[in-house]
């Protein structure tokens, strides 16, 4: 029985956001029809407006979708504090705050539309300059930008019955359990730390420790691992019986980042379990969408 999976980092913090989201929607509209589960990283999630005002592709009747904010705990803390101080006005004040934040979203979107790739270049190549910029000139823009950042899992609701949850391990990840051809599947949507291999490796080990507590026949890890084939993360997975779908089908790792002249393979779909055949595995997308190539595959669950 065929299970089709797709992972893609949409990178809100990048140039030409207004143009890119149109292109992203066109790609996802087609992929929603052809995939059973789509996991997205760095998806843009408004606080008050419906998320399908940004991702029109999510209006498809074929799917259900579950977003989780990167800083969901912090956002919840703010709203809980409001409830404590103004218990009788909680609903009204929460609405007003979300309304204001969604207006700020317009400013944030414009900023990253015009300067996103410049910020990204400084972040990776001149971290001290980036830090000074972050702390002095544009702190509100960056802080608010992260408030709208999150992960999303899109599921073909006619084919898969599941509930998507999230857990924090230094960064949040999403996970869902479902039965497929009488096999217990556990799938995780992952976005590991980009700051260092050490941090990402610690997060991965916590994720694996968590999945070991959940009964399953097949484990699927999909997302942006921010880890090259020479990393501790990659070595750990290959040494623990995980298979990269791209490597298995093409006998090599295919570079996924950046989208223009890719330098490294950091986006993967990893599988572990018996009675799974990789029917196909490919990368897709270009710089008109985001700075990451996406990965998709078809698995035959026997």
Each model region followed by its residue ranges:
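Active-site regions of metal-assisted phosphoester/phosphodiester hydrolases
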Residues: 1-32, 37, 45-56, 60-70, ...
